[in-house]
């Protein structure tokens, strides 16, 4: 298995994702999206797709730095804003985050990271209510499967064009879209503290884990067959456990079933239920 | 149709919900819950159930007042805390909420209400991470169906024992559990601003709408049959539209389907996937 095995027809993919954004946004009478533009590749790709799908006047980028956010991230976000000629607002999260942090010791990085991600969600959703727009999500499939994200934080959105694309495929799409290579080639980071990098956090590269997840999910290969491809047993077991343990992040809250029709269990209409039009 | 038609065997219901809490919490190695105790009937019932299911030492109540929260709400929350002999913490949301409110005009009550609900979610989830506990939800079925709640705010939880109970049934259960009648009989309020009441907000009573929802969902009665029960056409149409329009609040974010196995669409294991034990 090679990373190239995950490659997609990126021209066709661009068309599908543009149609997805147009359809899922306009069917409810909306015409615009707002997204958090972090300076990373995922949000850059979503911004690019949204502009191509809806037009630059219908895309608002929120820059939501914390006082410790890297200068580089903001510069890369500005690079995309100029490239796409879209409106942008800078809404620092420092005041709110620091209020929350008063009760959170400095070393509690995961708790602080979750608080920042959720503070950003509060801002994004308030701006979407202010403007009558929808929040575009930027979580990719690798993050969603590993649970490498914050519930009700960066994982919260109305429409997410990247949720079924491994990071490797987001990179391929980014190259196809002509996203500046400086954003594609730098080490991915959620920028939650200085020098933070996803891959050092996780202890493996996106390239490695994407191949493993692809073999597990898409190819449905058994453990022995995957180990036969040169994947170590410890890596396999660790990733499998991450996927299983984080299933709750991919589901609605558990509701105690009492009646014959329980929201989310057997009262499950599609989002665009027939009466809405 | 009479409100009594919605009545349940509340003794059996208590047993079912206690078993639900025990099972859904302990199966993942947790033993405790944290919940927002507002002084209202829903959170009082969840606190009571949690104590009976897990023991008072495993229930933490967070009181999260805003500077405009009613004194009465806090007193009623304290009433329950004494009754149940549980630990409690007061974490005012005023500093964080006011930071967010700087960009939100005074009159924008819905936006401010959503910000407060999400600020409380951030606190609840941080405390659950701090203590290694799960967040117990307090949204009832009437709220979930009408969309009368905040996504990623009060609707966010790990386990929700009330999600399949109409408000009428929560009241019945509250009486069975012996919840102080002062909490049962007062006008339900999310306490988002002074004098706020759900029923004046909604323009109808919980009793009326529960009967209508029950006929629509559980009894699957057609429009004409329901109007034949004395429900006005305008009330029927308005409630039906609320239920349909808020379906998105009961679903995970929409993900563009690209692969053969898309998180949430056809990669749908139960929350307690077999490997977790």
UniProtKB/Swiss-Prot annotation, chains A, B:
It is an enzyme of class 6 (ligase). GO terms for biological process: NAD biosynthetic process. Its EC number is 6.3.1.5. Keywords: ATP-binding, Ligase, Magnesium, Metal-binding, NAD, Nucleotide-binding. Gene3D superfamilies: HUPs (3.40.50.620). Deamido-NAD(+) binds at residue 118. InterPro entries: NAD/GMP_synthase, NAD_synthase, NH(3)-dep_NAD(+)_synth, Rossmann-like_a/b/a_fold. One of its GO terms (molecular function) is ATP binding. The keyword Cell cycle does not apply. Pathway: Cofactor biosynthesis; NAD(+) biosynthesis; NAD(+) from deamido-NAD(+) (ammonia route): step 1/1. GO terms for cellular component: cytoplasm. CDD domains: NAD_synthase. The keyword Cell wall biogenesis/degradation does not apply. Pfam families: NAD_synthase (PF02540). Disulfide bonds: none annotated. ATP binds at residues 36-43, 138, 167, 189. It catalyses: deamido-NAD(+) + NH4(+) + ATP = AMP + diphosphate + NAD(+) + H(+). Mg(2+) binds at residues 42, 143. NCBIfam families: nadE (TIGR00552), PRK13980.1 (NF010587). PANTHER family: GLUTAMINE-DEPENDENT NAD(+) SYNTHETASE (PTHR23090:SF9), NH 3 /GLUTAMINE-DEPENDENT NAD + SYNTHETASE (PTHR23090). Homodimer. HAMAP family: NadE_ammonia_dep. Catalyzes the ATP-dependent amidation of deamido-NAD to form NAD. Uses ammonia as a nitrogen source. Belongs to the NAD synthetase family. This is NH(3)-dependent NAD(+) synthetase. It comes from Chlorobium luteolum (strain DSM 273 / BCRC 81028 / 2530).
């Amino acid at each position: 298995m090679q990373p190239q095995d995950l490659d997609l027809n990126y021209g066709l993919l661009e068309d599908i994702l543009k149609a997805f954004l147009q359809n899922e946004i306009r069917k409810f009478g909306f015409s615009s999206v707002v997204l958090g533009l972090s300076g990373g590749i995922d949000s850059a790709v979503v911004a690019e797709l949204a502009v191509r799908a809806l037009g630059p006047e219908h895309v608002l980028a929120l820059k939501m730095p914390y006082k410790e956010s890297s200068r580089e991230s903001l510069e890369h976000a500005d690079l995309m804003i100029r490239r796409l000629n879209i409106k942008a607002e800078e809404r620092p999260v420092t005041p709110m985050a620091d209020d929350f942090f008063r009760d959170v010791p400095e070393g509690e990085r995961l708790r602080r990271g979750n608080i920042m991600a959720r503070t950003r969600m509060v801002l994004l959703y308030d701006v979407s209510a202010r403007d009558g727009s929808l929040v575009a999500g930027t979580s990719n499939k690798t993050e969603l499967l590993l649970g490498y994200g914050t519930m009700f934080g960066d994982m919260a959105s109305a429409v997410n064009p990247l949720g079924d694309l491994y990071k490797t495929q987001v990179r391929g799409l980014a190259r196809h879209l002509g996203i500046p290579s400086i954003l594609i080639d730098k080490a991915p980071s959620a920028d939650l503290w200085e020098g933070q990098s996803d891959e050092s956090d996780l202890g493996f590269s996106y390239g490695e884990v994407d191949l493993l997840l692809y073999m597990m999910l898409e190819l449905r290969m058994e453990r022995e067959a995957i180990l036969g491809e040169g994947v170590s047993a410890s890596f396999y077991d660790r990733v499998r456990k991450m996927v299983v343990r984080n299933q709750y992040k991919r589901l609605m809250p558990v509701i105690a079933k009492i009646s014959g029709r329980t929201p989310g269990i057997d009262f499950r209409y599609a989002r665009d239920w027939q009466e809405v039009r």
